[in-house]
Amino acid sequence: MRAAFLLVFVGLVACGDDGGGSVSLDDAPSVFRAEYCRYLTRCGVVPDEAECAGLNIGFGSHVDPSLRAAIDAGKIKFNSAILGRCYHQIGSISCDRTDESARQFGGIACYGAILGTVDTGGQCAVDTECLSKMCDVPACPDACCQGTCIGVAVAPPPYQIGVACQTTSDCESGAYCDSTTDVCTALKPAGATCTSTNECPYGMGCAGLTGTRTCKTLPVVGEACPDGQCRDAGTYCTAAKACAKVGLPGDACATNGDCSSFYVCDGTQHCAQGAHEGESCAVNARCADYGNFCDNATKICKGLQPDGATCTSSSQCESVFCTGTTGAMICQVEPICI
């Protein structure tokens, strides 16, 4: 089966109020970035939304041409109003990573933004085209291969305890998606062994330095963090084992770990943006500017590459499609598969 389309991380949003207007397919990437920057600013991960807009925060401006073609062909329904509501809510996600809103990404708030229309037995190229969200595509040498929708239509979330799931956002409040059984399971009690915060009661996280991890209350700024974890986004456990706010540009630091994940500790021992386009990224390997990447061969920050340029991954291309044999890959126009 081929992976389903992702509409600029349509699932990376929280359930909450119903604000936000309609968002068109063309505007989806920029709206998502703006809402994500609002969240990062509010939680102290970046200094302000204006700086965030120009930072390399991991999301581009590309809309999958195959998604657009599938919508035009009627294989996928696109609802701009639901997407608008969905994206608007990301800026309101709780900075408390143990809060329910910080865990229940997607689910009913985003269901229906993109929906497949092809029934079982129908022709498909990707999972998202199918009502079952399962497209069985045989192995073939071509860039686009046609398959068949299999399975039964997927019911809308949230799912009750005991029902099959793919992610925790599929499950009802008070439950998580067990990664071993793929079934919605009741949250564990305080003190129970765990592998992920998703398993713990709201307000608690899964923590422990070595051996068994358990569900417990996580520390906040100013409190000791013997397990090396802090509760809130925008905070970290220092070398002295105390929770503190992450460093932003100009703040003193000893290592990259003292700075927000979007910044580096420079040679003056202060948090900084990192290398800009045309500058060396040999030391920290982070390029600061939106759309830039660190070229492995030259160790220089480069902008997105045009069709015909050499590449090692699709994220380096303007087309977001890098193909070819190892050592001879180039950026090309992305094939449309529907």
PLM-predicted stretches and their roles:
Residues 12-14:
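C-terminal motif of bacterial Sec signal peptides marking the signal peptidase cleavage site
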Residues 2, 25, 29-32, 229, ...:
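Short linear sequence motifs
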Residues 1-8:
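Sec-dependent signal peptide recognition
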Residues 16-18:
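Bacterial signal peptide processing site
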Residues 20-131, 138-159:
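Mature extracellular/luminal domains of secreted and GPI-anchored eukaryotic proteins, especially small
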Residues 105-338:
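Secreted, cysteine-rich disulfide-bonded mini-domains of extracellular proteins
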